[in-house]
Structures are given as structure tokens and as C-alpha cells.
Amino acid sequence: MENTKTNASSSGMSSSSSFSVSYAEEMLLADEVSKINSMSILGPNQLKLCTQLVLSNGAAPVVLSLVSKEKKSILSRILPKIGQRLYVHHSAIYLLYMPNILKSSSGSITLKLFDEATEELVDVDTDHDATQACIFAGRYPRSILAKDAAKGHDLKLVVHAVASTKANSAVGVLYPIWEDELSRKQILERGADFLKFPIAETEPVRDLLNAGKLTDFVLDRTRLGVGSKNDPSPVLLEPRAKITGKAKTVFIPEGPSVPNTTISGMAPTVRIDAGSPKGLGVPKGFTYESFIKDEILPDH
């Protein structure tokens, strides 16, 4: 069964165009779409992580097509067979953002969806804190014509980053994850804002407080001391000459009968003790030889 439709202007047949539709073609379209959806690489509800986008400070906006190369290749093969009555749906779009800059810096990220065929924009987030990791989740509420997607006029993700850090330095990394499903039916959904799920910072991945490793590190690079653990308390220091021993002084009373005696060539020194209670005399029987031997040279 085949029908023909003709469009004419008000002036008659001055301008016309016609095309034919076929029930067989519609069935072929349904069969082809079913085959596409049954393929593991292009199955429905299959999310795709195709790339990562490094966002540079102040650089030109990054633009990414949200129709994968695999889908475009399939479209280029099947569109001549089934005509142009096929659509691409983006029923799930996730954008994982991981910052490269510290919390002490500042910056913002702008994310938008752009339908190149209709030149329409949908805001994902126009002022996201560039220091905060998060996941954006949402969808595009309209279908993209397969013929437009095959030509590259598809849904685009546009991202721009500005921060207080060095120009053209990496502000963060964006991981787009999406679903691009082929269907012969259009979608008509209410537009909804993208959801944003912040990601908390994690604990350190390594424990620094390992006493054994720190001790080994110090021992390898430090000269160890062997002195006392505690220094002495400050005290008054009095410099004095050190006396090794006390000299012995011999008091020898001198009388008129005391001879000058020399023993072994050594003459003893005689000190006159005028204050002796016994006067200037000497005891009876006193001799220098016995005094020297007994008092001065007891070891000889």
C-alpha cells in the first residue's frame, strides 16, 4: 500500500513537492531499530564514558558532541535504507567534575547543553564553584533528529572555566557520561533543572604517623649524640688555684750549742722561733741528725 502526498501553492501547481510512504518501509524501520537496540554496544539504557575534558583557566569553551561515533556510524549506514524517520534520545546525562585547584583558590564553571540543529541552549549550571567536586544529573527533554545527528548537528556540551590561578592552568577535569538511544518515537518531556550532588573530600590515602618509618628516616640522615640527656643547671663558677697538698713546716728552736749539720750534702733550713715557750734552748740530747731522720726524712 502506497500513498502520495502533494503540496501546492495557492496559485495552483506552480510549485509542488511530493514523496511516497510505504507500510513496508515503516516495518523495515521498526525492524532496524529493534536490531540496533539489541546490539550490546548500542543497547538501550547503556551509559557511555567516552572521554575526559581538562578545563583550563580562561581558555576557549570546550565543546563535546553527545552523540557517540558508534551511533553516527550506524546512522550513516541505516538512514539510506529507512529514510529519516529516526530520533536520538538523551534520557540520561551525568557530568562528573573533579577539581584540580585547592579550596584556598576561587573559580567558577559554566556548563550548558546546545542543540546545534535548533540553536537552543539549556543551562546545566552557570556558576558552579570550581573547587567543589560534584556530579550533575539530568536529561535533554526533546529528541534529536537522526538525520541532523548524522551530519553533526547534534546535542553539544559546552563547558567554560575561570579561576584565580595561573592562566591556562588546569582548573579541573570533567567526565561526561551519557545515554544516546535510537528510537522511531519522539520524546516530549517537561524541562527540568539538572540535579547537583556535591562530593565530600576524602580522608588521606596514606598514614604519615608511622613511628617506625619516621625513626628510620631520621636515623639515616641524623648524627646521633651520646652525651647526657640533661644539661647541668647554671651555677656560679669561682676560678681558684688547685692545691695538690699542704706543705709541712718544721719549727726548729735554735740554741747557742746547736751545730750547723749537713746530711747527705743537704743543709736543712733553720727557722728561729723566738716565741717558743721553751726559749731559745733545745731539749737535752737533741741532735740534728736524729731530728732530720725522724721528722723530715722518715722514709729514709
Swiss-Prot record:
Q: Which GO terms describe its cellular component?
A: host cell plasmodesma
Which GO biological-process labels does this protein carry? Answer: transport of virus in host, cell to cell
Q: Which domain of life is it from?
A: Viruses
**Keywords, ordered alphabetically:** Host cell junction, Transport, Viral movement protein
Q: Where in the cell is it found?
A: Host cell junction, Host plasmodesma
Q: Would you identify the family this protein belongs to, as annotated? A: Belongs to the alfamovirus movement protein family.
Q: What does this protein do?
A: Transports viral genome to neighboring plant cells directly through plasmosdesmata, without any budding. The movement protein allows efficient cell to cell propagation, by bypassing the host cell wall barrier. Acts by forming a tubular structure at the host plasmodesmata, enlarging it enough to allow free passage of virion capsids.
Can you say what this protein is called? Movement protein
